[in-house]
Amino acid sequence: MARQRKKKGRPVSGWVVFDKPKGMKSTEAVSKIKWLFHAQKAGHAGTLDPLASGLLPIALGEATKTVPYVMQGKKTYRFHIAWGQERSTDDLEGEITKTSLKRPTQEEILALLPQYTGIILQTPPQFSAIKIAGNRAYDLAREGEVIEIPPREVEIETFKLVETPTKEHSVFEITCGKGTYVRSLARDMGRDLGCYGHIADLRRIAVAPFCEEDLVTWDELKAAISPNKNTTDENENSFEKDFLTLDELLIETGAALDCLPHYPLTDTQAQRVMRGHSIPLSAQKTLLDEEEVCVLYKEQLLAIGTLDKGLFKPKRIFTI
């Protein structure tokens, strides 16, 4: 029988609500956080473009089991649209493809916003992670191919014009559902206003249930460790980690599941759930069969499961 390989790192669990700086890829951010915490496992809940900054939820350990719930959460973005140019990537990185001397008035912009609120059809950018015949759209676009990407429904809950500092650009804030491309909004609004547009700045400020108040920067994380006198290269374990201080910056795993009902368990119930058994659950409110709920043991998240005729059936069990 093959010997199971021991996992490297600490079995640390929780959420780092990371304030990703511009220029850093989401995968790079995950690698840096995983290294810093010396975590066995890490992942993020929703890619943020390299040119964008802001809230990137990074799950460590057991929290990775809750990533799908955060990815379904509403997201809030604040962004600047620069008027007068359309670009190949719909942001500052791309080549200019169309120009216009027209600049929209505030009245024209406000009149357009209702058309972009609610359930709308949106075509993702040519440079996006959408798969076309097994290939990423951005790979095909880099090879010079102009591809047909079918439009899809997205939900925009709120769309506000924050300010128009100059006639050249406007600042907006939206709360939207999964799969919304802010770059597509800039492109489409520019076309509708007859002036063209692209994203000049993009910052994510919320991914439900996390918000700006939860953000932690790379500098704040590094402040929880002390430099190793022997080296200054962080890629060679140049820091002696103060894990106690670092771990205090984590948000508990269960915070990602605020959208689900929570129920405490007795010792006996918890023991059965830990073994994967179903248990009777006395709900404080009427719950539908197949509705997902969380169960807690000693105020710690123990399992996610569904109800079936008053029985709780564990689907995901957490190590506590």
From Swiss-Prot:
Signal peptide residues on this chain, from the entry's feature table: none
Keyword Transmembrane helix appears in the UniProt entry: no
Listed Gene3D superfamilies: Pseudouridine synthase (3.30.2350.10)
Keyword Isomerase appears in the UniProt entry: yes
Residues at the catalytic site: D49
A molecular function GO annotation: tRNA pseudouridine(55) synthase activity
This protein's UniProt keywords: Isomerase, tRNA processing
One Pfam match: TruB_N
EC identifiers of the protein: 5.4.99.25
Gene Ontology biological process terms, A to Z: mRNA pseudouridine synthesis; tRNA pseudouridine synthesis
EC primary class: isomerase
Catalytic activity field: uridine(55) in tRNA = pseudouridine(55) in tRNA
Role according to the record: Responsible for synthesis of pseudouridine from uracil-55 in the psi GC loop of transfer RNAs.
Similarity-based family: Belongs to the pseudouridine synthase TruB family. Type 1 subfamily.
Designated name of the protein: tRNA pseudouridine synthase B
Organism of provenance: Bartonella tribocorum (strain CIP 105476 / IBS 506)
